[in-house]
A protein has these predicted regions:
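Short amphipathic alpha-helical surface micro-motifs
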Residues: 51-52, 68-71, 115, 132-134, ...
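Gram-negative outer-membrane beta-barrel transporters
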Residues: 1-98
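Hydrophobic, lipid-facing positions within transmembrane beta-strands of outer-membrane proteins
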Residues: 8-12, 56, 66-72, 130-136, ...
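Weak global preference for isoleucine
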Residues: 10, 24, 46, 70-72, ...
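Intrinsic disorder/low-complexity segments enriched in polar/small residues
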Residues: 9, 117-120, 196, 220
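C-terminal beta-signal and adjacent terminal beta-strands/loops
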Residues: 79-113, 127-131, 138-226
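Extracellular/periplasm-exposed beta-strand and loop segments of Gram-negative cell-envelope proteins
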Residues: 1-5, 33-46, 52-63, 100-107, ...
Length: 226
């Protein structure tokens, strides 16, 4: 197996002591991932399809140029009017992952076994992502028993974050099949009343939830320490 990959970049980290009630942790990474194969079976698939072995490096599937995170933690301690209260906010940013622009093909019907690229390997860039998570907690002392209540909110702003795309469009909800003659024939065959019905029917079939990260999620809980 002659495949290889390299990953190079820079990482920056800033951590503060607790200043008053607040502590900050910030991180940033600049990364370049390139090589001749993104996973262990890349060479096998090329040989199976009768292709030529790569002679130059390309961006890898997991090549992500920028990632950053910021944690802001606030704690009141055991003094003051709002004692034993805490809040933690986590912000995360990631630039888009790579994909290879390809000819349109159906994502739900059989036929074509693999994509047919129309541009350089992994030359397309998926949308970037931004997420924020929040945790708030408060502890009450009841007869030397610590009762803590907490609320965790994942994806606070309910951002729609794309995790995978179709190689034709670079979008999570368009595989390009309806732009082909075969796709138009399918729409005409399954349309009831209007062509729009057939298009909506097909698009509903390719709207995979796995192409998106989770929406806002709220958890409430109680913790007892004794």
């Amino acid at each position: 197996n002659g495949d290889f990959s390299t990953n190079k970049g820079l990482a920056f980290s800033l951590r503060t002591r607790r200043l008053g009630n607040t502590k900050i942790d910030a991180n940033y990474t600049l990364s370049y991932a390139g090589g001749t194969g993104s996973n262990a079976d890349t060479g096998y698939r090329i040989a199976w399809l009768g292709g030529n072995d790569p002679t130059f490096t390309s961006p890898l599937n997991f090549d992500q140029r920028h990632t950053a995170s910021l944690v802001i933690d606030y704690r009141t301690g055991n003094k003051g009017l709002l004692k034993l209260f805490g809040a933690n906010m986590l912000f995360r940013y990631g630039s888009g992952m790579k994909y290879t622009p390809s000819k349109p093909r159906t994502a739900i019907f059989g036929g074509q076994l693999s994509d047919q690229p129309i541009a350089a390997l992994n030359s397309g860039v998926m949308p970037s992502t931004f997420n924020a998570d929040l945790r708030v907690d408060k502890t009450f002392m009841v007869n030397n028993v610590a009762v803590g209540v907490f609320c965790i909110v994942n994806n606070v702003f309910n951002n729609q974050m794309v995790t995978d795309v179709y190689n034709y469009s670079g979008l999570p909800d368009n595989d390009g099949y309806l732009t082909t003659q075969a796709g138009q024939n399918w729409v005409n065959d399954y349309s009831i009343g209007t062509q729009a019905f057939g298009e909506q029917l097909y698009n509903s079939r390719i709207a995979y939830p796995t192409n998106y990260a989770s929406a806002r999620h709220v958890q409430l809980g109680v913790r007892v320490d004794f």
